[in-house]
Every structure is written in structure tokens, then in C-alpha cells.
């Protein structure tokens, strides 16, 4: 063990834990990341699928890694490269497809095939979404205040929050109507929001996918419109709204973070599950590992989810009953599944022509928002989705390091999938998804 006493110990080596550790180490603190696996990365890990094939185990594309984090942690210095892709597509059962391109004119012509009105409306839609992104982005870096608290810190936080909107108003950015529109947008379903702009089912379905992917929401769910923003506010190489592949898989991100941490004197203690957080006089002061070792720290950060933190590694006696019950009743339900497929060759799609830039990005299988909501209804009722929403990509087109020469790797993300206690039933839904792919 490198040290037994630190300024800060971080339980869990996912990308959030590593980012926190890197900033603290850069500030001169003695930091340790404690990870149960023999490797760090959490949901951003690159693993070997078959000899020669690399796959991203969970997350699969990159956009929301903030550019300031990229710069501050010098991630490019430690080998991180994001490769942008130029388009995406939704494939329909009748052989048609809607392609979404980063090029304005190509995108206009693609939408106009389905609706000239929608092609005209898309520019207004894009401007409105970008306006919401500009409002939200600064808030993501603010610590949210507790509106029920009278602590000076929270009161000051609320004042800062109010000042932010007041300043926007003074600059002509947010008037009374704009504030109303923003609050309305945050609470809308993505279905209702898109209905205000578009008439084509495939255009609406393509855009709605960004609001439900990786969530336990359907396109009719209130609040799903807000999720859409997270797929527009990211950027790659300064291009806002762009997406890309991390060269070598998503694990290259956390590998670069780990290198940055070590370069600033931080430690990574891998293969060391934490079984208990030590608490004395209502303050955490260390952890106990599975092998019985103890690591002490002045401050403790948990990169685990709220349930694992307070129900698994903190003893119940250390928590107020109302807090314990609130955490126990907090819903965390998985709704997504992922297939990683090694390919002998590139698929030949019935709809997307060979060489079309739309084929380099994310490819969706769905017919309409109504079909997506039906898949969500199946999941809510405890059934496997009969017509699941599929979001797939082939990173090896842009990044040949992911597969042997001439071969390819396909990532397939599926909405909606039953929770882990039903994994014994996976063969049938996996066959269904594979059949959907083969039909395209």
C-alpha cells in the first residue's frame, strides 16, 4: 500500500471520481482513488471482446467531456484523442432512412425528403435548443443550493442563482417570456416539444432518441425534453453539438485521467473493494478494505451511487432514520442494455448507401415516437420491449485500432431492458435485437 493516510480518499474509480481526484491532486493535496476492480474507469472502460477486438463496455461516444477538463488535466498529453463523426441516421422498415448531417445543406435536403416544412423549421429548432443550452451550461458548474436551508452557504447559493438570471435579463438574454419558456421547456415531454416544430414521424423519432437514451423515461414523460439538451450542449474540438469516438475506446478517457492523476502525485489503489466507511463523531475519516486494511483520510469522496454509498458501506446506525429511508426508497432502475459485436466485415445496409457519412455515426432503429413509447410501456409493465429502440454505431470505421485489419466492431445500445434479476431471460431479447439488425 503506497500510503495509509491521505488528505482525500475517493471511493470508486469511475470518470467522475478520477476527475475529482485529478483536480484535488493538481491543487497539491495527497489523494488516493480506491477501486474494487483491477482497473479504473467505471462506465468508461475499454476491454477485449475477442483477441484483437476492443470494445467500450458501457458508454460508447463522447461529447459531454467538458473542454476545460480536457485542458486542465492535459488529457491530450496523456494520449486522449476524440475522433468526430459526420452524421447519424434512422432506418425505417420500408427501406427509407433519415440521415442527419453536420453539414447544413446536406441536412436540409435530407429533412426535405420527408417534409419541406420540417426542413425550414429545423433551423428555428436548432436556434431554440442552443439558446436553452447557453442557459443551462453555466448552471452545470454551479453547486446547487438547498432551497429549504437557512445556512449562509445555501442562502448565498440561491442569491448567486437569482443573480445569474438577473444578469441575463440585463444583457437582454432572458426577459419574462424567455424565463417562462425556459421553465416550460424543462418540464415538457420531448414528444410535445418536437410537435411544436415538426410533422414528420421519422424526423421527430430521430431527434427524440436523444431524450430517452440511457434513461428510465419515455418520449411522453414530463422532463424528457430537458434531457435532449445534454446531446446538444457537448462539443468536440470546439464544435458545439458534435460527437465523436475516443480513439482506443472510452477507456482511453479514464486511462488518460489516471495518468494525469499519477503525474500530479495521486495514488490509485486498485483491486481493493471498500466494505465500510469509518465514521466517528458524525464525520468520515477513512475506509476498511475487503482484506481488512484501513486507509485514513481527512476528507472522503464517494464515486458510488447513493444507494451503494449509504446502504452498503455506511452502517445504518450512523444515519438519521428519515435520511436512511429516503435513500432506501430512492428509485434506481436500469432500463438499458448493450451488445458488443465483433464483425468480420462492414454491414451492407438496405437503406444507407456505402460511404454515406451518416453511416459513420449513431444509427437508430425505430419507426415513430409512438413506437418508442410502446417500448417504454412494455418496460414499465415488467415486460421485455417487443419493438425496442436501438441505437448502434461502428466505431472501427473511424478508429481502426478497435478491431483487426479488415474487421469491425459494433456497439448496440437498447431501450428498454429489464433489470439484472432477469438476466437469465436475455437470450430471447438478444435474438430479437439481432433479428432487427439483420433486417436492416
Q: Positions of the model-derived regions?
A:
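Mid-domain catalytic core of redox enzymes
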Residues: 240-247, 273-404
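A conserved beta-strand/loop element that lines the FAD pocket in flavoprotein oxidoreductases
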Residues: 260-274
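A short, glycine/Asx- and small/polar-enriched loop/turn
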Residues: 94-95, 218-222, 278-285, 406-408
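Single conserved hydrophobic/aromatic residue that forms the stacking wall/gate
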Residues: 421-440
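Short coil-to-beta-strand
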Residues: 99, 222-229, 405-414
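N-terminal glycine-rich phosphate/pyrophosphate-binding loop and immediately adjacent elements
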Residues: 2-154
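Active-site/ligand-binding neighborhood in enzyme catalytic cores
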Residues: 130-264
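Helix-rich C-terminal "cap"/substrate-channel and partner-interaction subdomain
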Residues: 124-160, 308, 388-420, 424
Amino acid at each position: 500500500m503506497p500510503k495509509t493516510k491521505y488528505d482525500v480518499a475517493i471511493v470508486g474509480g469511475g470518470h467522475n471520481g478520477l476527475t475529482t481526484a485529478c483536480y484535488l491532486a493538481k491543487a497539491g493535496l495527497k489523494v488516493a482513488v480506491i477501486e474494487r476492480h483491477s482497473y479504473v474507469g467505471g462506465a468508461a472502460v475499454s476491454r477485449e471482446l475477442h483477441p484483437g477486438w476492443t470494445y467500450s463496455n458501457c458508454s460508447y461516444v463522447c461529447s459531454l467531456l467538458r473542454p476545460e477538463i480536457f485542458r486542465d488535466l492535459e488529457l491530450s498529453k496523456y494520449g486522449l484523442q476524440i475522433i468526430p463523426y459526420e452524421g447519424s441516421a434512422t432506418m425505417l422498415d420500408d427501406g427509407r432512412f433519415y440521415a442527419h448531417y453536420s453539414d447544413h445543406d446536406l441536412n436540409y435536403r435530407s429533412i426535405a425528403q420527408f417534409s419541406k416544412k420540417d426542413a425550414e423549421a429545423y433551423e428555428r429548432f436548432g436556434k431554440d435548443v442552443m439558446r436553452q443550452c447557453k442557459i443551462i451550461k453555466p448552471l452545470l458548474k454551479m453547486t446547487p443550493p438547498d432551497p429549504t436551508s437557512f445556512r449562509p452557504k445555501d442562502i448565498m447559493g440561491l442569491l448567486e442563482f437569482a443573480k445569474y438570471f438577473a444578469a441575463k435579463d440585463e444583457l437582454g438574454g432572458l426577459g419574462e417570456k424567455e424565463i417562462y419558456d425556459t421553465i416550460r421547456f424543462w418540464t415538457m415531454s420531448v414528444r410535445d416539444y418536437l410537435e411544436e416544430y415538426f410533422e414528420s414521424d421519422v424526423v421527430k423519432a430521430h431527434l427524440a432518441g436523444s431524450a430517452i437514451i440511457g434513461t428510465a423515461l419515455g418520449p411522453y414523460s414530463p422532463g424528457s425534453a430537458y434531457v435532449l439538451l445534454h446531446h446538444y450542449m457537448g462539443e468536440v474540438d470546439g464544435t458545439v453539438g458534435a460527437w465523436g469516438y475516443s480513439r482506443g475506446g472510452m477507456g482511453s478517457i479514464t486511462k488518460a485521467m489516471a495518468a494525469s492523476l499519477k503525474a500530479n502525485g495521486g495514488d490509485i489503489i486498485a483491486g481493493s473493494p471498500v466494505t465500510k466507511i469509518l465514521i466517528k463523531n458524525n464525520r468520515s475519516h477513512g475506509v476498511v478494505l475487503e482484506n481488512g486494511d484501513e486507509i485514513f483520510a481527512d476528507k472522503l469522496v464517494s464515486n458510488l451511487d447513493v444507494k451503494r454509498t449509504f446502504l452498503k458501506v455506511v452502517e445504518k446506525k450512523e444515519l438519521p432514520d428519515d435520511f436512511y429511508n429516503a435513500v432506501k426508497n430512492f428509485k434506481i432502475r436500469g432500463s438499458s442494455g448493450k451488445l458488443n459485436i465483433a464483425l468480420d466485415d462492414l454491414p451492407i445496409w438496405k437503406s444507407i448507401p456505402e460511404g454515406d457519412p451518416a453511416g459513420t455515426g449513431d444509427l437508430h432503429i425505430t419507426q415513430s415516437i409512438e413506437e418508442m413509447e410502446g417500448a417504454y410501456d412494455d418496460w414499465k409493465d415488467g415486460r421485455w420491449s417487443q419493438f425496442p429502440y436501438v441505437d448502434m454505431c461502428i466505431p472501427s470505421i473511424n478508429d481502426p485500432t478497435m478491431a483487426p485489419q479488415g474487421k469491425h466492431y459494433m456497439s448496440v445500445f437498447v431501450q428498454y431492458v429489464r433489470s439484472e434479476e432477469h438476466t437469465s431471460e436475455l437470450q430471447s431479447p438478444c435474438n430479437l435485437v439481432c433479428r432487427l439488425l439483420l433486417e436492416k
